[in-house]
Amino acid sequence: FYDGNQWPDGLPGFTETVREYMATLTSLGKSMLPLWARALDLEPGFFDPYFENNYTYFRMAHYPPVPDLGENEFGLGPHADTGFMTFLPQADVDGLEILDVDGEWFRPPQMHDAILVNTGQFLERWSNDRFRATPHRVIPPKEVDRYSIALFVNSAFEPVCECLPTCTGPDNPPKYPTQSYYDFYLWYMQNTYPHYGGFEEELADQDKSDITH
């Protein structure tokens, strides 16, 4: 889905630091899987097989100041992440807003050294809407630059996932098809970015093990 990283020149130790950070937070995410499982009335190790050789990616974002922000202008528009969970250390500058269940946007309180954990769309589908993907957006700052780093911890591409048995029943049938994260993400990309559909046959022939993690 993505090409290889473009590491910047002239920053000694940057690549190693990022890779270490990704490995550390991926390990943290996997250590939290029993918590998700127990919250969904599953055995603690239920999710472990789905996260062997899992797909993790990392994104850095820079939001330059916008002194005169227009209506419906965003640094990052409203959306929910696609995967299982996202780790988002709180930035020093406000801007992140989350949509609550009443349809109101709010800014989470600033907590030093805190990491926000967002649930993603694949977890929402897997849990048959028991967990809600976290809608959020970013309002750009007016005076200073804002930087953000997000790490997305997802299941492996290949395992096929169906709505969890503890989240379905006679009065609550599955709302989503049985599919792998690969198939879901391909569907998402094709529906979000229309030009992406042109690569469907090429992606179908590509060995999934060759996809950059």
Which functions belong to the PLM regions below?
Residues 1-213:
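Peripheral, non-catalytic segments flanking oxidoreductase cores
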